[in-house]
Regions:
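Gly/Ser-rich, acidic/histidine-flanked active-site/gating loops
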Residues: 1-32, 65-66, 71
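Short helix-loop capping/hinge segments that flank enzyme active sites or metal/cofactor-binding pockets
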Residues: 17, 34-87, 99, 103, ...
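Short, surface-exposed loop/helix-turn segments at secondary-structure junctions
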Residues: 74, 106-127
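Structural helix-boundary/capping segments
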Residues: 3-12, 67, 72-76, 84, ...
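Conserved beta-strand edge residues that scaffold enzyme active sites
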Residues: 22-24, 103-104, 148, 190
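Short low-complexity, flexible loop/linker segments enriched in glycine and/or proline
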Residues: 30-35, 113-114, 157-159
């Protein structure tokens, strides 16, 4: 789906190149920060109301309970390295356009995606890596609609910008939305 939108960015005056930022350690550092935050904000809930929590929330909080100070320190050091690598990447490219998620929307009865293209996901949030890798970089991003699957399910792209260039990200998102009009479309599955 992303490739089919390339011409839109060309039409908007962008020079479009294939490029891969280095997301080394993004997965592990994000999971540490997420677990740490969950434990800080929901640790009392786990201790006092465990029987009322969903298994996914328990898993999230327990990831934070297991952490040590050195774990969080490591994650912070790696986050800064990731931030610097992304800054270097963004010095060469003004924007990064990437998928919002690694797969199209799934059935509402399914709690989370456990497998993508035959690859088993390590945990219940692994299918969202394309989003949380960007989050871990600390760079501004926005998700905008870019079309529909053959089944009529909505698909989006992320527009990622340079650090502190939220305005540039919003401008490109607006231009892309105006050029495509997908934001006005009601997914066929909803009609």
């Amino acid at each position: 789906m992303l490739e089919s939108q390339r011409h839109i960015f060309d039409h908007l005056g962008c020079n479009v190149f294939e490029a891969d930022p280095d997301f080394t350690d993004a997965d592990e550092l994000f999971l540490i920060w997420r677990g740490w935050g969950r434990e800080i904000n929901q640790g009392d809930n786990l201790r006092n109301n465990r029987d009322k929590l969903k298994d996914t929330m328990i898993w999230d909080i327990e990831q934070g309970v297991k952490l040590s100070g050195p774990d969080v320190g490591w994650a912070e050091a790696k986050r800064m390295e990731l931030f610097q690598r992304m800054n270097q990447f963004m010095n060469e490219y003004e924007f990064l356009i990437c998928p919002v998620s690694q797969r199209p929307p799934f059935n509402i009865e399914q709690r989370w995606v456990s497998e993508i293209n035959g690859v088993k996901m390590e945990n219940f949030i692994a299918w969202m890596k394309s989003c949380y890798y960007i989050t871990a970089t600390g760079h501004p991003a926005i998700s905008v609609p870019c079309g529909f699957t053959a089944e009529g399910l909505p698909v989006g792209v992320q527009i990622v910008g340079r650090y502190r260039d939220e305005f540039g990200v919003l401008q490109l998102a607006k231009a892309f939305e105006d050029a495509t009009g997908f934001w006005k479309s009601i997914p066929p599955v909803c009609t």
